[in-house]
Each structure stands twice: as C-alpha cells, then as structure tokens.
Amino acid sequence: MVYSYTEKKRIRKDFGKRPQVLDVPYLLSIQLDSFQKFIEQDPEGQYGLEAAFRSVFPIQSYSGNSELQYVSYRLGEPVFDVQECQIRGVTYSAPLRVKLRLVIYEREAPEGTVKDIKEQEVYMGEIPLMTDNGTFVINGTERVIVSQLHRSPGVFFDSDKGKTHSSGKVLYNARIIPYRGSWLDFEFDPKDNLFVRIDRRRKLPATIILRALNYTTEQILDLFFEKVIFEIRDNKLQMELVPERLRGETASFDIEANGKVYVEKGRRITARHIRQLEKDDVKLIEVSVEYIAGKVVAKDYIDESTGELICAANMELSLDLLAKLSQSGHKRIETLFTNDLDHGPYISETLRVDPTNDRLSALVEIYRMMRPGEPPTREAAESLFENLFFSEDRYDLSAVGRMKFNRSLLREEIEGSGILSKDDIIDVMKKLIDIRNGKGEVDDIDHLGNRRIRSVGEMAENQFRVGLVRVERAVKERLSLGDLDTLMPQDMINAKPISAAVKEFFGSSQLSQFMDQNNPLSEITHKRRISALGPGGLTRERAGFEVRDVHPTHYGRVCPIETPEGPNIGLINSLSVYAQTNEYGFLETPYRKVTDGVVTDEIHYLSAIEEGNYVIAQANSNLDEEGHFVEDLVTCRSKGESSLFSRDQVDYMDVSTQQVVSVGASLIPFLEHDDANRALMGANMQRQAVPTLRADKPLVGTGMERAVAVDSGVTAVAKRGGVVQYVDASRIVIKVNEDEMYPGEAGIDIYNLTKYTRSNQNTCINQMPCVSLGEPVERGDVLADGPSTDLGELALGQNMRVAFMPWNGYNFEDSILVSERVVQEDRFTTIHIQELACVSRDTKLGPEEITADIPNVGEAALSKLDESGIVYIGAEVTGGDILVGKVTPKGETQLTPEEKLLRAIFGEKASDVKDSSLRVPNGVSGTVIDVQVFTRDGVEKDKRALEIEEMQLKQAKKDLSEELQILEAGLFSRIRAVLVAGGVEAEKLDKLPRDRWLELGLTDEEKQNQLEQLAEQYDELKHEFEKKLEAKRRKITQGDDLAPGVLKIVKVYLAVKRRIQPGDKMAGRHGNKGVISKINPIEDMPYDENGTPVDIVLNPLGVPSRMNIGQILETHLGMAAKGIGDKINAMLKQQQEVAKLREFIQRAYDLGADVRQKVDLSTFSDEEVMRLAENLRKGMPIATPVFDGAKEAEIKELLKLGDLPTSGQIRLYDGRTGEQFERPVTVGYMYMLKLNHLVDDKMHARSTGSYSLVTQQPLGGKAQFGGQRFGEMEVWALEAYGAAYTLQEMLTVKSDDVNGRTKMYKNIVDGNHQMEPGMPESFNVLLKEIRSLGINIELEDE
C-alpha cells in the first residue's frame, strides 16, 4: 500500500481479511448532490429550479392576449460568508434573479401576431445555500434537512388481510398515488362489489368512474368479461364450447356431441375430459333450456319490428325472455362467462348497485361526493372531473410514478404522460379483479422498491413551486386588468410569497432540524438520516409494527441497527455506508458482478426492485486467487430469503462486509459479537459523546475512523499538494506543487482555522494544526484536527485501563468506579461554550439603555464591567454576576411628598428606571471568552462597540496583509526565476529592491512576455487586496439589520470547563453505559504486579445478561495494542538502533492470518520509522472491521508479541490492603466516552419560586426553576407512617394553600412558628371541574 507523508505518521494495523474492492464513498453526497441538482441549470428541465419555472410558466392572461414567459435564472453572490452569517444571526443565502419576457399579442390580428415584447430581470427572493458540509445556516443557526422516505407514487395493490370484516373475508384494494393530485382508490366490499373513492372520501360504485369516462353498460361488460354464446337452432339450444372453461365444474346434464357422451350428468369435469373434448374438436354442444336461465345478457337486444327493448345488457335471462328473444328473431345470444373459482361477476354486480345510467348522472354523482351541498351544473361537474385526474396543472404522476405504474401493470414502456388515461384506470381495475380472482399477488408496501427517498433538493423544489403557484394567480389578475403597454414584468411579480414559502420550509418544516453537533459523528449521522415522518409521511401514532420492522430489502440500503429507542423506533433510519439514491429516488447498493463463476471487480448498483431477480453471495464467501468461489455451495440471498446455492447460480456478490450497517454502527469494533439491542444503544450513544480537551484515537477501531473525520468537514483538508510554508494556531499556508497550479496564479493555499467557537450543543469547536513547517502534503491530507479528531481519525473518547471486578458495591447496577488519576490528567475534561444575549429595545416609555450606571447595585457587582456596562473579556464569572448592565424606563408612579423632595434635591435618574441587566444564570460559572455588540443602523455606537470594531479591522487588515505578503513572496520567487533565466545575474538582482525588479527589461522576447504577465498579476494582486480590505471594512463598520424595535444586541460567550464527577454518564461503544458512583483515590485502586493501578472498575455482571461480548474482546485487543506500544516505548527509551525498531514494528504489522494490509517498512526512511515509533509508543492502533474482524487466535498472538498472558487476565492487588485478589481479573484497554448528560446540567434545587396560575402549585423542572413533586405514592408513604401533621403541611402550606402559605411566611418573620392550614387551591379547581359537568357541589360550614 502507498501511504502519503501524513498517513505514515501513524498507521493502523488492519485485521480485515477481505480485499477492499470499493472505497467508502463521500459520506455527505446524499445532501450535496441533491442540492446541487436543485440549483444548477438543467437544460432538460427535469430537476430543480428550472423544472419548477417550466411547470408554472408561461402564464397566460384569461383572455389569451398576453403571456409572461420564463427565459432563464441566475443566483447572485451571497452578501456574507458562512461564519459572518452565524455571528450576525442571518441566513446564508443568495438572491435569485429571473429573466422574464412579457409578450403582448395583437387583439384583432390572426392568432400569434406579436404586438410587443419586453424582457426584464426580476428579483424573486433569496434561496438559502448549502454550506460545503451539507448544512444550511438559517437565522445564524446550522440546520440540516433530513431526507424523507415516503411511499413512491404509482399504483399499489393491497388487502386488509381479513381485518375489516367480522367474517375474516380478505378485501382487496388498489390505490393510485400521484406525486401531486387526488388519490384514486378502488376497493371491494364484503359483498364483492367494487367501489371507488377519490381522496379517501365517501365511496361510490366503481362503474361510476367508467360511466364518467363515457362508457356504456355494454362497453363496460365487454371490457371485463369473456362471453358464452348460445344459438337457437331447430328449437334446440346449443352452446359454443370452450372446453378449458369447464374445468372443475360439475355437469348438470350429459355432455354429448356427435352421439358420444363425454361426461355423464352429476360427474365432476376433469382435465382428462377436457383433453378428449379438445381432441375431438367439439365446438357446439346441446344444452337444456334450464341451463341458460339465470345467465346474464352481455348486450342490449331490441325487437327490430317495433324498436322495443326486449332485454338490456346485464339483465338475467329467464325462460320468458328467452321465448321473447326467439320470437323476435334473435337466434344468437351472448351471455357473460362467470364462475365462482376464477371469473367472478364483480363488475356485473356493481353495475346493479350503480344508481347512474349515463355520463351526466355519473359526473353529477361525483360532483356531489366531492362538493356536498353545492348545486351541480353540467359545466361544473365536467370541469371538476377533468381537473381531478386529467389536468397537467392539478395532477402529476411524475416520472417515478409513471415508471412504477407501468411496471406494476407489466407494460413494456416505462415512460409516458404524467396524467391518467382511460386505459390506465381500466387496467388497474382489471388487475385488481384478477387479484380477487386469485391471479397475481398484492404488493408489499414496506418493500424499498415501493418507498423512495425525497432529499433536500426535491423538497425545496416543491416548496418553491408552491410559492410560484401563489404568484401565478396574482400575475393572471394583473395581465387581465389592462394597461399592458406601461406594464413591466417586475410590476407583476411579488417576491414575498415565494420567499415566504421557501423560508417556511427551511425555518419551520418538520424535516428542517437543528443540527446535532455534539461531535463529528453526530453531524454526519444527522445528515445521513432518513425519516418516514414529516409532511406527506407517516405519523408516530398511526405507524404500525410492519412499517417499523427490518425488511429484507433494507440490506445494504438502510441500517438494521441504528434507529432511536422510543416512539420513533424504526421510523427514523440511517443510510448504510455504501448506499446511494438512483435517478428515481430509490435506494441502491453496490454489488460485484459474477460472470461465469468468476467474481469480477465490476461494480453494479442495484435497487431493491432489480435485486429481487438475482442471487447474491455474501461478502465473506471465500474466493481463490482467480476469483472463483472455493466452496461448492455458497450462502446467498435471493428474493429476500437466505439459503445455499451452487456456485454457478450466483449472479452478484456483496462489495464489503460493512455494507449492511450505517456509519455509526460501522465504528463499533467486534459488532458481530454484540446483541443487536445493545449495538443499537452503542451506535446511538457514540453520537452523544462530548469532545474531550485532548482527543485520543481509539486503540481498537474499525478503520472507518479516518473516513468519518475527513468527510464530516471538522478537519482542515489539503485541497492541493505542496509544502507547508507557514503554520501557527490559526492559519496554515501551503506552497502548491508546480504541477497542481492553475496557469497564472501565485500557487499559495491559505487555510484559516476555526478557534474556540460554540457548536449547536454548546460544545467547543476548535481546530489545531497537525503538520509542521516544511512538511510535504498531498491532496486530501489532514492539515488540522478539529473537535474529536486525532491525526485525522475520529476520536470520540479516551482509552482507559479497565478491570472487570466488583469493588465494594461501587459498581452495583452499572455504576462506574473511576480513579482520581483520570481527573488529574484531565482525561475527560470538556469545554462548553454558552452564548448569553442581552437585547436592548425601544419601549413605549423610552429606549432601554446599556450602561454601567445601574440603580441600587453595589460597587462590587459592577467590578467586572467596563464603562459601557459590558463585561470585559477574560473575566471569571459565577451565577448571579452581571454581564451586561441594562436599565429599562419604568412608568410614572404616584410619588409621596417625601420622594418628590428627594427627587428635587438629587435629580431624576435613579428612580424612573429599573435594573434589567443580563446576569449569569444560576449554577453556571466560567470565563468570558468573547463579546459581540450589534448596533442598529442609525443608533450611535458605544465605546465598547467601537473598540471591538477597531480590533476586528486591525485583525482583518493583519490577515489580509499577511496573505498578500505570502502571495507576493510566491510571485516574486517566480519573477526572480524568469529574470535569472533571462540572463540577469542573481547576486546583482538580490541587491536590487524587489519593487524595481519589474522595471528591468529582457532581450529574450518570450521571457520579457512572461515578465510582463507576472507584472500584471502583481498589479492585480494589489488591486484585489485593496478591494478585499474595503469590502471587509464596509462589512465591519456598517450597522446591523436587527429585528423591529431592537436597538442593540450584546452577545457574551462563556467558556465552562467541566471535569468528570460522580453523576456524569459514561459509556463504551457496545451499549455498556453507566453513571460514575465515586472518584476513588489512586492509592486505593486495584494495581497489577508492576504497580500500575487501573483507571476504571466495571461490574462483570453487566456483560453476560446483556450479551455484548464485543467489549471483552475489545478489552483484550486493547491490552495487546498497549503491550506492543509499551515495548516500542522501552526500545525508544533505551535508544536502540532503528533497525531493531523497524524489525519489531514490521513483525507487529505482519501478524495475523492473510491480512489485507501489507505494510512494508523497508520503503520508509529512518526518520519516518522513528516518527512512526514515536506515535506508537502509547499503543499500536488496530482496525478490526465489522463482520471481518480479528479472530481469537490472532488476539492471542498479538498478546504474546506484547509479552502479556494470552488469557487476557492478570493478578491484581487491593490498593487499600496490598493483598492479592483471589483470582485473576480481566484487565485491558477499553475506549470510553463521556456522554452529554452531565450532572451539572441536571442538578437543581429550589427554595422559593414561581407558582402555576391555575392550581397555584409550584412549577416542575429545572427550566422553570420548579420544585420536586410530592406525588401520590409519596403521600401513601406518609399515610402508612401515620405522619398526619407532616402530610398536612405537605398538602397545604408547602404546596397550594395560598392564604396558609402567606400567613406562614408572616409568622416566621414574626418569630411565631405556627401554621394555619386552609383549603388547597387544587381542591377548588376540582370543585369547579365538577360544577362544569353540571353537578352542583358546595361546602357546608357546620
């Protein structure tokens, strides 16, 4: 394997056996690709904004004399960049400008004669833009649009599985679901009549739809039935025979022909009889007259002499009717062929319950059902029916819908119109009747071929279209109002409805969610989440078990493990590692093609629909060198079932063992040894890990860590290769390699790092460089680590030395005992940043003022404020401290004469304002790390605001001039090269000042041209610099766009350092979670023979019942990794020669059977080997991929190499007594996470506080500063103890006896410790409640 310079710093030993055929794809592509499709110009007009515009435009006036046409659109540049938007609290968006053309036609002239054309660019609101990491910044906060899994448009055949009717009869139904428009349902009732519903309203007989489509009874019967033809000859009744139809019937008369009896009366007709009839080519048989009675006529029969209707289609024949028909000369009678087995008389029966008899009555019936209570007119009824399914504006199946529709009806072509045709409706009815007749199967709604993904781009497009349609109405009105000569396109378009629709979607849609930003993994998972909830989806309450369940088609598309616990289980899923969506929005997963029994490296992506036709082998099937299967029988999946197939039957093979799971689950080592429920918890808890102060890569990983860290966007990644030219804490400069430069550029890349900013979850985002000066880097190398990343690998927690043993009950029931050393070394110390805002508004009584002059506040409380009344940076503050002093004018109150006198003497100020300062919330303490002041345009800036501005300007100038210097240096080095090549002596040149170099002339014309080009570039560079500086200055000094009535906003950022303490929640990666019960002194912890104490003691009883054995294997392997690290460390300390180190490290990497990774240290320089050894001294990181991990024997080998016992257990001694514990204990290294459930955020106590309005009881919860509820069970406890007085005070004065508690307060003040309990307020509420039910209830005083 070839490693880049940065990757050589620390190589993970990989235990994977299967070769990696396909690299892990870019993990955020589902978001970025979808949005790209939305905003990029699509010449076909299939997707995105283009499609939305084309579907609404051209807009014609009602008269048709003018129309507004769409030409093209363009997106402008965003005003602020992403960081500025976050700081200012605005949306990161770009203006949308659309070129429209107004065409006015001549009124009197022939059609299409143009009178006037006006073209203009019109502003149509702002479109939020996606950041590079797949998020949106809306009002300053990062949000994610979650993809939705909804039912694909198309036609679905389903049954109620016998649940609707008490008889248990299975009722079948068909539903046509368009992308937008009305749903059309067909369903059978228990009497086998076929009904139709439109938009789930009242049901009507299904034949009404056919009548509305202008079919007569005769045509309807002709469509749905086969015919039986009877002929009257010589007063005998003969029937045309189709032998196949007789199968399974019982003969009601002798079947004879040509004097031969084929079936005797009363006998069952079998296949043998049918073969004989076919062999003798029997076409007609004689039947008795009784046989025809009860048959149904297929068409109308009219007496031609009188013109009178003898019998209408769908009438039952009787002997009288037969005689009439015979008399009027009808010798050939067509009847419907029906039987109970596979040709039911459903449509014929339905026609009998159908009240309508022609098109008009059918249309009226539909109109009455859709618009009850409105008087139907012919026109209204016709237009309503037309608009339901046959109008492009109101109805659209979409390309997906048409494809699914045609596939379901087994048609050849998959493209077609977006509206329904007559044939579509009839074919659906025919297929439904076939299914009722026992031919064909119902669809499985939970099959991923019937559910598709709607991503950001598509949802935004739909919202945008909604806005356009609102505008369309207004435009039509304007076009009709006349005076078109002076009208311009922009006078007609109001951008408000469009931007409102888009804003509503991004701001408040159920699928637009506040990004989960705890750590890089939670970001990635959130962006790859797939929800079945949301508009047009399911609701929690109505979703049954089937929808939530794992389906065979989830394999490789949706993760079977990662889903929330609780009411949303199974409704919110995570995309599998390799899954992607196809053009129709269905999930597909990659497979390796198998041709002629050889597994090739050709990759095909298959959707769930296509996959059903193939036999697919698992990724862990063994192959030989050429790619043949080793075993004769291979475990494969086919049509959702798993079984053994011979190797020639295999069509495809899985790409990777981790294809099944999502990113979160693929980070759990030894996942294959964990119970699914615990794996689910493990995958979910990794997302709650708080980034620690110093990230520590996991010793035991899965090899996915690098992909997650790089794709999440929290690290700085090199865009192009080069050499590190400058590096400090906040920026990295790279001189780009010659071959990667664009022609005519300076060849310098500058990466500015993010420093100590707040995430959505109040954790700290900070980037630290991990390259040093002069290092070569390649494209894609990690230059700086972000939160929870270590040398470009995801690092959510810390490697802790754990022992599985009981310790004095401190690890009872999943409690965790932690050593004090963990606290001392700050292993789990985290930084949290809180943003506190103070808003100064304009009130009716005057503006609020931000000032240090606050009434009735002592000098001490103001000690941390500057003269503007704002806290200074670096101040350490605790709960209740003032951060921003603010006073609010208060209303004039009636003054007493004394007060008037005092005011006259001392002046006004003190009494007419009240203190409304921003204070630190209770229980919070920390350091002020940043202050920002936003001032409204036109409001005078205070001193602090000007200082901050000055500082920002200085910083911006410094940044830009440094940037300029770097670029200049790059440019001048190229100028120097040209001059030297052109014959100028290098020494003389260096003595000349750089600015004068460009004045030199060269004799070589080509070199002179190059020099002139470089001179032009230099001028451009300086010009660009001035432009940038001016733009920055404008941005910094301009006023801010604040909400109405807001004059100033001051934001204060507090950094809080949280050490680990009892009550904090910790977890491993296998769902093994617990709460810290005690921080134990180091000297009391169990220690091994070398005197090394353990860091954490876990309860061994937490393992067997939970069945997550992965944690034990991880512990053993972690021990081995650490053992090898210790040996390398010892060698480094003894300063042994490089060759020995190289040999030992090579041995460690080569260990294990047939490992896919081949590390060849002979290609490394000595310096590189030393650097690698330096990075391995804390332990050799190991990857054990999911379902392809290290085997037990390999772990033992590795333990042996690290000179450790292969049992993984060692003797421990009690730290307090020094005695040995009686049996060896499992000790090793486990990766532990600190979860974002910190005791500091949960601890809370109340002395006095607010009460609920109605019940007058104290509120509950920390946010409301509430009390602890003394509930029903607690009352029982006091009752059981007979503690009557305690109980009385609990239920009265301490809760909601209003008078009692006031009196009590008064008594305590007076020093009289007595209470007088009265009536609790909640009792009065109960009385009122009973009275509201109409029952009078009164308290009688005796």
Swiss-Prot record:
Keywords, sorted A to Z: Acetylation, DNA-directed RNA polymerase, Nucleotidyltransferase, Transcription, Transferase
Enzyme Commission numbers on file: 2.7.7.6
Indicate the enzyme's highest-level EC class.
Answer: transferase
Q: Cellular component terms, GO, for this chain's entry?
A: DNA-directed RNA polymerase complex
Q: Which reaction does it catalyse?
A: RNA(n) + a ribonucleoside 5'-triphosphate = RNA(n+1) + diphosphate
What GO annotations for molecular function exist for this entry? DNA binding; DNA-directed RNA polymerase activity; ribonucleoside binding
Q: Which GO terms describe its biological process?
A: DNA-templated transcription
Q: Which residues, renumbered to this chain, carry the PTM N6-acetyllysine?
A: 1022, 1200
Under InterPro entries, the record lists: DNA-dir_RNA_pol_bsu_ext_1_sf, DNA-dir_RNA_pol_bsu_external_1, DNA-dir_RNA_pol_su2, DNA-dir_RNAP_su2_dom, DNA-dir_RNAP_su2_hyb_sf, RNA_pol_bsu_bac, RNA_pol_bsu_CS, RNA_pol_bsu_protrusion
PANTHER family associated with the record = DNA-DIRECTED RNA POLYMERASE I SUBUNIT 2
Q: What does this protein do?
A: DNA-dependent RNA polymerase catalyzes the transcription of DNA into RNA using the four ribonucleoside triphosphates as substrates.
**Descriptive protein name:** DNA-directed RNA polymerase subunit beta
Organism this protein belongs to? Escherichia coli O81 (strain ED1a)
Gene transcribed to yield this protein: rpoB
